[in-house]
Design a protein with these regions (language model features):
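A residue-level marker of the well-folded mature domains of exported/periplasmic proteins
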Residues: 1-267
Length: 267
């Protein structure tokens, strides 16, 4: 925030890239992926691919409690999962804070913070692994079987998947991810991770350059929403995201030139 304020004082137009600068009115524009849509896509995938029946064990994990995007990702996921939690399709089994709020569709920032504080992975592979191990150790067989797991990104997804895949009482798991990391694409091909949300940084970069050019030309950049950064509503341009599964890895990532087929085995 301090750097943005210094730039603003010099008459510079400040464009936040991917991460929103919070707590200052020195931000003019924001270019980002639709973080809410990322979480909603993760949650919807779990709903669409959950085993039949009700009372399906649901394990919730989130990013860092210090990261504004982690809140938006989780909020997006909650927006689609909450009705299915409230009607008994899913049963939250690793967060009593989330259970206490399971009948509430719209959570306040404080309520989100309470849940995320309990299920945070800090965006760290080892933290996610330890938390998953602790959750499975604390739970009995009735909270295992065929389960669904909301993992916030690819690194944490792989860590959690590694833990769940070695528990003899977990017969299957559906798990989300985000970022289309090479290691997770291989996991998806191998059936160890269910999906990832692909955020094409080439498109994000192009959108940010277009915004900067508009500013330099004295024009008002194209925006499609606003994000509140705790000091103002910042005009923003959101870049679309793509759900990637084993079925569309080739078309989404190889044919588009993002990765090469030789980067993976089993394609």
């Amino acid at each position: 925030a301090a750097a943005a304020e210094t730039a603003k004082a010099e008459g510079v137009t400040v464009i936040a890239y991917d991460r929103l600068i919070t707590g200052t009115d020195a931000v003019d524009y924001y270019v980002t992926f639709d973080s809410f849509a990322v979480g909603a896509a993760q949650g919807q995938f779990l709903i669409d691919n959950a085993p039949a029946g009700s009372g399906i064990p649901l394990y919730l994990y989130a990013g860092a409690a210090t990261d504004n995007n982690a809140f938006i990702f989780f909020q997006g996921a909650w927006s689609v999962l909450q009705p299915k939690i409230a009607d008994g399709t899913f049963k939250i089994v690793n967060s009593d804070e989330a259970v206490a709020l399971q009948d509430k569709a719209d959570l306040t920032r404080e309520e989100l913070s309470t849940i995320i504080g309990q299920i945070t992975t800090d965006w760290d592979f080892n933290v996610a692994k330890s938390k998953a191990e602790a959750n499975l150790t604390a739970n009995g067989a009735d909270a295992k079987g065929d389960v669904c797991v909301l993992a916030p990104n690819d690194g944490t997804s792989r860590a959690i998947a590694d833990v769940f895949s070695t528990d003899k009482d977990v017969t299957s798991y559906v798990i989300s991810g985000q970022d289309a990391e090479k290691a997770s694409i291989q996991y998806i091909i191998d059936g160890k991770q269910s999906m990832t949300v692909f955020k094409d940084t080439r498109t994000l970069a192009a959108d940010s350059v277009a915004m900067a050019v508009s500013v330099l030309n004295g024009e008002t950049p194209a925006t499609d929403t606003t994000y509140n950064n705790e000091a103002k509503d910042v005009p923003a341009k959101q870049t679309d995201v793509v759900v990637v599964t084993k079925d569309n890895v080739k078309s989404a990532l190889i044919d588009s030139g993002y990765y090469e087929a030789g980067d993976f085995t089993g394609l």
